[in-house]
Amino acid sequence: MTVKTRFAPSPTGYLHIGGVRTALFSWAFARHHKGEFLLRIEDTDLARSTAESVNIILDGMKWVGLNYDNADNVVYQTRRFDRYKEVIAELLEKGHAYYCYCSKEELEAMREKAEKEGTATYDRRWRPEAGKTLPEIPAGVQPVVRFKTPLDGVTRWADLVKGEISIPNEALDDLIIARSDGSPTYNFCVVVDDYDMGVTHVIRGDDHVNNTPKQINILKAIGATLPEYGHLPMILNEQGKKISKRSGDTVAITDFGAMGILPEAMLNYLARLGWAHGDDEFFTMEQFIEWFDLKDVSPSPSRMDLKKLYWINGEHIKITPNGKLAELVKPRLALRDIHETEKPALEDVLALVKDRAQDLNTLADECLYFYVKQTPTEADVQKHWDDEAAARMLRFAERLEGLEDWNAEAIHDLFKPFCDEEGIKMGKLGMPLRLAVCGTAKTPSVDAVLALIGKEEVLKRIRA
């Protein structure tokens, strides 16, 4: 059997990080088992689904690098209405579904009664049964189509995350599978799609647990082999509440990109939300695929921890090739009005500073003074700069100007003799030198920084 999983987002605004984690676990499960990972766009909500939202999903999947095996044949539910109608007709013909002519008022009365009695909402008055007389069909009413849910027994499944789950069928409604205008409903479309796509493992959020028995019963009615189900726990915010844009939480995957998070780090972090491999916190996707198993996913909710996300991101920045980092940092430097990054070469700059940043925006800031001297903070000036320091910098500039070989080692060799002559400690040279050349007291080794900026530019800045 070829393992087939799917990710089935609804294009109604943005790609949620909870959805990305679901996609990640589905993707990793398929890759671990040498199977297929498929994408389906559940766009039947015509009022909310837009082409722009579809592109947001596709762009988000591309950004995080979750490649799907049906890239040339992504399934869109709105293109499958004929297929849904075909299956509905089959269910009606075989007696697994029926027409219901209830009015909104009747359904509301049933709902109120069911709430009081704790029973299923719909009283099945239009359900055909042996020896039962159905009401007279009202004039001018377009019926819905309902599925005939089994009246006795239980629907059970061995959930790959939550364990054994069983729901008494008497607690389930005869759900509507086609509205009065003929359009199919969510739970029905999902079943037909999973069946036609050959999905073997449905991995999704645990907000779908209540949908599962309904979908299992429909699958049985159409004669399908049941997939296995795994329901993932919710991701909570740092306060332990449901993540919500309204609460100020970052929820869209694209927002994390704007925050300077690498896609590899985002996936690494999301993988650790609910799944563990011993004490391993930092790993590559190749390692994750090798290690991943749904049995290691906790059924309990996970809590966001932005500090940990940034730490993981910093670790990924350290191992990212400088050439790749340069392509990610250049646009951020352009936003800071730095467009020329050849002198010094940005890759060389990144090699020196990338250990100092946990996100790409901070990394871009760390590169600025290599190209343009920054304005020192008042605190740095008060602490490290005075007339004596200014005069000392001019004297040290003469030593620098005399260097024939401009490199970090040669620059470093000037420090001790100069400090001895001046009767100062290294801090009295290094800190003012950083301010004079870079405009900040916080830099890597000052000899390496000066070597990269270049002799002509260093002397110009000191003497400005």
Swiss-Prot record:
It is found in: Cytoplasm. Pfam families: Anticodon_2 (PF19269), tRNA-synt_1c (PF00749). Its EC number is 6.1.1.17. GO terms for molecular function: ATP binding; glutamate-tRNA ligase activity; tRNA binding; zinc ion binding. One of its GO terms (cellular component) is cytosol. Signal peptide: none annotated. ATP binds at K245. It catalyses: tRNA(Glu) + L-glutamate + ATP = L-glutamyl-tRNA(Glu) + AMP + diphosphate. Its main location: cytoplasm. A motif ('HIGH' region) lies at residues 9-19. The keyword Aminoacyl-tRNA synthetase applies. Gene3D superfamilies: 1.10.10.350, HUPs. A motif ('KMSKS' region) lies at residues 242-246. It comes from the Bacteria. Monomer. Belongs to the class-I aminoacyl-tRNA synthetase family. Glutamate--tRNA ligase type 1 subfamily. HAMAP family: Glu_tRNA_synth_type1. Catalyzes the attachment of glutamate to tRNA(Glu) in a two-step reaction: glutamate is first activated by ATP to form Glu-AMP and then transferred to the acceptor end of tRNA(Glu). This is Glutamate--tRNA ligase.
